[in-house]
Regions:
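Acidic, polar-rich low-complexity tracts and alpha-helical solenoid repeat scaffolds
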Residues: 1-295
């Protein structure tokens, strides 16, 4: 490659270093990845991949827990009015990630909105929209969350199926059991359960039906659907632990303490023992021992 006044002119080289940086990133070798990216930024400032390299550098910074550095650099990058299209989407998505990591959710929302409008990739659009819904949900902006999950549902075939199904489940969590139309709810969920395309997500849908009956105190039906969710083999261990926990709670309310204890045991097996939830259930389970002894 020719070195013209300190900057190199060889379009293949920047691409090669970019691939190298990404390979190192995926091997969790973040410092060497950063070195390759910095090399591009210093040696090929005129590269047409420069924005892409800059976004990747901040992706690495975020993995190194340097959120403040990433935020500063990305904000500077976004002041450049030549950045557009996918680069604009990627930079904003990365900025949103940095803000989410440090729990500044409202600013993450603003960045994610730009990313979702700027991306040309439907899978990304669906993912960003879904995450946006989750952020609104976290901040208890329930109406915005509901509408945002509806956007994902309306994307239909343009979105990966999992986001559509999860969005239905998220909306279901907002269902008003006192005033809501329970018949319409059951009809909608039965239709989702019967749809062949949703087969890989029966764990999510059955769990939601379980919650629906659980909230209304219909214990037998709730247990039936939680068990169905357990039987639909799930990749989501937290969902599985939630099924066991909720069945355990029902048996507990029914004063069947021995059975409740077994379900709490199954819950604990699938939970991270460092979480607050684990400790809470463990305490409840340990307290049951005395009750079971006298049962």
């Amino acid at each position: 490659s020719m070195n013209i006044a300190g900057t190199e002119k060889n379009p293949q080289m920047d691409e090669a270093y970019l691939l190298l940086a990404k390979a190192r990133y995926y091997e969790n070798r973040f410092i060497p990845s950063l070195e390759a990216l910095n090399y591009i930024l210093y040696k090929y400032p005129l590269s047409d991949r420069i924005y892409h390299a800059k976004v990747w550098r901040e992706k690495v910074n975020i993995r190194l827990d340097n959120e403040d550095v990433a935020i500063k650099n990305l904000k500077r990058l976004l002041k450049d009015d030549k950045i557009q299209g996918q680069d604009l989407a990627d930079a904003n998505a990365m900025l949103a990630q940095a803000y989410m990591n440090i729990q500044v959710k409202d600013t993450a929302i603003a960045a994610l909105k730009v990313a979702k409008e700027a991306t040309n990739d439907n899978e990304e659009k669906a993912r960003y929209t879904f995450i946006l819904g989750q952020l609104y949900e976290n901040l208890q902006y329930n109406d915005s969350a509901y509408a945002t999950f509806q956007e994902v549902i309306d994307m239909n075939r343009k979105s990966p199926r999992r986001y559509v199904v999860q969005s239905h489940a998220k909306q279901a969590l907002q269902f008003d059991y006192k005033k809501g139309d329970t018949l319409a709810f059951v009809e909608k969920f039965n239709k989702l359960l019967e749809d062949r395309e949703n087969r890989p997500y029966l764990d999510v849908l059955n769990h939601q039906m379980g919650i629906f009956y659980d909230k209304q105190g219909l214990n037998q039906k709730a247990k039936l659907y939680y068990n169905k969710s357990i039987k639909s083999v799930s990749q989501d261990s937290y969902l599985v632990s939630s099924n066991y926990r909720n069945i355990g709670e029902i048996y507990f309310k029914e004063a069947q303490y021995k059975t409740a204890g077994k379900y709490y045991d199954s819950t604990l097996l699938r939970l991270n023992d460092r979480t607050r939830e684990y400790r809470k259930i463990k305490k409840k389970r340990d307290n049951l021992e005395d009750v079971i002894k006298y049962e």
